[in-house]
Regions:
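Bacterial Sec-dependent N-terminal signal peptides
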Residues: 1-30
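N-terminal acidic, glycine/proline-rich low-complexity segments
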Residues: 29-281
Length: 281
């Protein structure tokens, strides 16, 4: 069993990435041989609209994952499960075109069934409080009989993960966590400290800089700048049309590195290069 000191800091990231086109081509990929089990915890609709951008990316590549949960977990702001359901509605409209290019996409109803409401608001000083639908779902998924771990991709605060670990500490050996840290650390300081102090052996990647590789650089030559929306995203299905609502179409997609980490390379070895970065202790 792969075990390593569980807090990793971003070392380097090399990305070549194209998003939100109906024709999907992946070149130079080191495909994961078995679909990873994933659960996404997101503060979509909360403090940062880039979660909608990354959710669009996830939905367009959802055939690559065995998705077991989509949890709304906004430490701040007014995000809710409805924000997830709204994105799935757009995905449902685009699905016929997506199916023309590749098989294996989950049905919209299957995705709706695994949308759960987590905590709305930051955890108190002790780092946990009462169970939520989202934290209970994390426990249920983690406890499934499987030879594969449940990868929990955290796009916001750690509040529901901390609650799940508090209520069911036995799951710590059944999950692996990739957390988009950075600003999210200040939104869920209490739950972060609780996890670090009480679960030192939890398999946990803390990625504090990977998202910077996705933020639009207006000065960059070519199409990978503020013109990217007009050249590559505008009119690309319902998800593409929706994209303009978030940062006026400028690409941020700060949570996407967690998806890329699962799509390429060896997720069990964070020290090797992958699309989602390589990490050191």
């Amino acid at each position: 069993t792969f075990k390593i000191k569980r807090i990793y800091i971003m070392k380097k990231l090399f990305l070549v990435f194209s998003i939100l086109t109906v024709s999907i081509t992946v070149m130079g990929q080191q495909p994961i041989p078995v679909k990873p089990r994933i659960l996404i915890s997101t503060d979509i609709g909360g403090t940062d609209p880039d979660d909608n951008q990354s959710m669009a990316h996830f939905l367009m590549y959802s055939e690559m994952f065995e998705t077991e949960g989509l949890v709304s977990s906004p430490s701040y702001g007014h995000g809710s499960k409805q924000n997830l359901l709204d994105m799935i509605d757009l995905y449902e409209k685009d699905l016929p075109k997506l199916k023309k290019h590749i098989k294996g996409f989950p049905s919209p109803d299957a995705l709706r069934a695994i949308c759960k409401q987590g905590r709305q608001g930051a955890a108190p000083f002790k780092g946990y409080t009462t169970a939520t639908e989202g934290s209970d779902w994390i426990i249920k998924c983690a406890r499934k009989e499987s030879t594969r771990p449940l990868w929990i991709l955290v796009w916001g605060g750690l509040d529901d993960l901390a609650q799940a670990l508090h209520d069911a500490p036995d799951i710590q050996n059944k999950i692996k966590v990739y957390w988009i840290g950075g600003p999210n650390k200040k939104w869920s300081t209490n739950s972060y400290v609780y996890i670090v102090e009480n679960f030192p052996n939890l398999w946990f990647i803390e990625a504090n800089a990977s998202y910077r590789g996705f933020i639009t650089n207006d000065k960059q030559p070519g199409k990978f700048n503020k013109d990217y929306y007009d050249e590559c995203i505008r009119g690309a299905g319902y998800l593409g049309k929706d994209y303009i609502k978030y940062y006026d179409g400028k690409v941020k997609m700060g949570d996407t590195p967690s998806l890329l980490y699962m799509m390429d390379g060896d997720p069990n070895n964070p020290q090797k290069e992958s699309w989602g970065g390589s990490f050191e202790k």
